[in-house]
Design a protein with these regions (language model features):
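Recognizes extended acidic, P/S/T-rich segments that occur
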Residues: 58-109, 126-132
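Bacterial N-terminal signal peptides that target proteins for export
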Residues: 1-3
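Acidic surface patches and DE-rich sequence motifs
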Residues: 122
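Pro/Thr/Ser/Gly-rich low-complexity, intrinsically disordered linker/stalk tracts
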Residues: 15-57, 110, 125-139
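C-terminal motif of bacterial Sec signal peptides marking the signal peptidase cleavage site
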Residues: 10-13
Length: 139
Protein backbone atom coordinates (compact mmCIF):
# COMPACT_ATOMS: atom_id res chain seq x y z
CA UNK A 1 0.00 0.00 0.00
CA UNK A 2 2.85 2.39 0.83
CA UNK A 3 4.41 1.68 -2.55
CA UNK A 4 1.17 2.50 -4.38
CA UNK A 5 0.72 5.73 -2.39
CA UNK A 6 4.34 6.76 -3.11
CA UNK A 7 3.88 6.01 -6.79
CA UNK A 8 0.69 8.12 -6.97
CA UNK A 9 2.36 11.07 -5.18
CA UNK A 10 5.42 10.78 -7.44
CA UNK A 11 3.33 10.71 -10.62
CA UNK A 12 1.18 13.65 -9.57
CA UNK A 13 4.20 15.76 -8.70
CA UNK A 14 5.87 15.15 -12.05
CA UNK A 15 5.16 17.38 -14.98
CA UNK A 16 6.50 20.34 -16.84
CA UNK A 17 8.19 22.79 -14.54
CA UNK A 18 8.88 26.40 -15.41
CA UNK A 19 10.28 29.51 -13.81
CA UNK A 20 7.81 31.33 -11.58
CA UNK A 21 5.76 33.87 -13.48
CA UNK A 22 3.57 36.56 -11.96
CA UNK A 23 0.38 36.57 -13.97
CA UNK A 24 -0.69 39.96 -12.64
CA UNK A 25 2.30 41.89 -14.04
CA UNK A 26 1.39 43.99 -17.03
CA UNK A 27 4.33 44.24 -19.40
CA UNK A 28 4.44 47.20 -21.83
CA UNK A 29 3.76 46.43 -25.48
CA UNK A 30 6.89 45.87 -27.57
CA UNK A 31 7.76 48.26 -30.39
CA UNK A 32 7.52 46.57 -33.80
CA UNK A 33 8.20 49.42 -36.25
CA UNK A 34 11.58 50.85 -35.18
CA UNK A 35 13.31 52.58 -38.10
CA UNK A 36 16.51 54.59 -38.60
CA UNK A 37 17.38 57.40 -41.01
CA UNK A 38 20.37 59.69 -41.45
CA UNK A 39 19.54 63.23 -40.39
CA UNK A 40 22.38 65.71 -40.67
CA UNK A 41 25.43 64.23 -38.96
CA UNK A 42 23.28 61.95 -36.78
CA UNK A 43 21.01 58.92 -36.93
CA UNK A 44 17.37 59.50 -36.10
CA UNK A 45 15.33 56.61 -34.70
CA UNK A 46 11.56 56.62 -35.04
CA UNK A 47 8.79 54.34 -33.76
CA UNK A 48 5.17 54.11 -32.66
CA UNK A 49 4.28 53.90 -28.97
CA UNK A 50 1.40 51.47 -28.43
CA UNK A 51 0.79 52.41 -24.78
CA UNK A 52 -1.79 55.13 -24.14
CA UNK A 53 -0.36 56.30 -20.80
CA UNK A 54 3.40 56.86 -20.98
CA UNK A 55 3.82 58.91 -17.78
CA UNK A 56 5.30 56.05 -15.74
CA UNK A 57 7.15 54.33 -18.60
CA UNK A 58 10.86 54.48 -19.38
CA UNK A 59 12.65 53.80 -22.62
CA UNK A 60 15.90 51.85 -23.06
CA UNK A 61 17.79 52.36 -26.31
CA UNK A 62 20.41 49.77 -27.25
CA UNK A 63 23.04 50.16 -29.99
CA UNK A 64 25.55 47.91 -31.72
CA UNK A 65 28.42 49.37 -33.73
CA UNK A 66 30.48 47.62 -36.43
CA UNK A 67 33.05 48.98 -38.82
CA UNK A 68 31.81 48.67 -42.39
CA UNK A 69 35.28 47.90 -43.67
CA UNK A 70 37.65 45.53 -41.95
CA UNK A 71 37.56 42.14 -40.36
CA UNK A 72 34.29 42.43 -38.40
CA UNK A 73 31.85 39.62 -39.05
CA UNK A 74 28.64 41.32 -40.19
CA UNK A 75 26.59 38.11 -39.90
CA UNK A 76 27.90 37.26 -36.39
CA UNK A 77 25.76 37.91 -33.30
CA UNK A 78 25.92 41.54 -32.19
CA UNK A 79 26.76 42.99 -28.79
CA UNK A 80 24.32 45.73 -27.87
CA UNK A 81 25.08 48.44 -25.32
CA UNK A 82 22.66 50.69 -23.49
CA UNK A 83 23.10 54.23 -24.87
CA UNK A 84 20.07 55.91 -23.28
CA UNK A 85 17.55 55.32 -20.50
CA UNK A 86 14.86 57.99 -20.72
CA UNK A 87 11.39 58.85 -19.52
CA UNK A 88 8.89 59.68 -22.26
CA UNK A 89 8.89 63.29 -20.99
CA UNK A 90 12.63 63.67 -21.62
CA UNK A 91 13.58 66.53 -23.94
CA UNK A 92 15.80 64.15 -25.96
CA UNK A 93 12.64 62.52 -27.33
CA UNK A 94 10.51 64.34 -29.88
CA UNK A 95 6.83 63.54 -30.35
CA UNK A 96 5.94 63.92 -34.03
CA UNK A 97 2.36 62.68 -33.71
CA UNK A 98 -0.02 61.32 -31.11
CA UNK A 99 1.92 58.05 -30.82
CA UNK A 100 5.02 58.76 -32.99
CA UNK A 101 8.36 59.35 -31.24
CA UNK A 102 11.88 60.10 -32.51
CA UNK A 103 15.30 60.08 -30.86
CA UNK A 104 18.49 61.57 -32.34
CA UNK A 105 21.69 59.57 -31.79
CA UNK A 106 24.49 62.13 -32.02
CA UNK A 107 27.22 59.70 -30.95
CA UNK A 108 27.81 58.14 -34.36
CA UNK A 109 30.99 57.98 -36.45
CA UNK A 110 31.56 57.72 -40.16
CA UNK A 111 32.39 54.31 -41.61
CA UNK A 112 30.28 52.29 -39.16
CA UNK A 113 27.19 50.11 -39.38
CA UNK A 114 24.79 50.83 -36.51
CA UNK A 115 22.04 48.51 -35.27
CA UNK A 116 19.42 49.59 -32.74
CA UNK A 117 16.81 47.96 -30.51
CA UNK A 118 14.55 49.53 -27.91
CA UNK A 119 12.56 48.29 -24.93
CA UNK A 120 9.81 50.01 -22.98
CA UNK A 121 9.79 49.43 -19.21
CA UNK A 122 7.20 50.14 -16.53
CA UNK A 123 7.86 51.81 -13.16
CA UNK A 124 8.68 48.43 -11.57
CA UNK A 125 11.41 47.76 -14.15
CA UNK A 126 9.44 45.10 -16.05
CA UNK A 127 10.31 45.56 -19.73
CA UNK A 128 8.70 44.69 -23.02
CA UNK A 129 10.37 42.32 -25.43
CA UNK A 130 13.07 43.91 -27.57
CA UNK A 131 11.86 45.75 -30.65
CA UNK A 132 12.71 44.83 -34.19
CA UNK A 133 16.26 45.75 -35.25
CA UNK A 134 16.81 48.97 -37.21
CA UNK A 135 20.14 49.27 -39.07
CA UNK A 136 21.87 52.20 -40.72
CA UNK A 137 25.25 52.47 -42.46
CA UNK A 138 26.71 55.84 -41.56
CA UNK A 139 28.85 57.24 -44.40
Amino acid sequence: MTTVFSLVVFCLSCGKKADPHCSYISYPAAVSDLNAIIKGGNIELGWTVKEKDTDSLRLRILRSELEKEGDNCISCPRRYFLIAKLSFRDSKLRWTGEHQVTYLDAGVRGGYLYSYKIMICNASGDCSDESNVAEMKFP
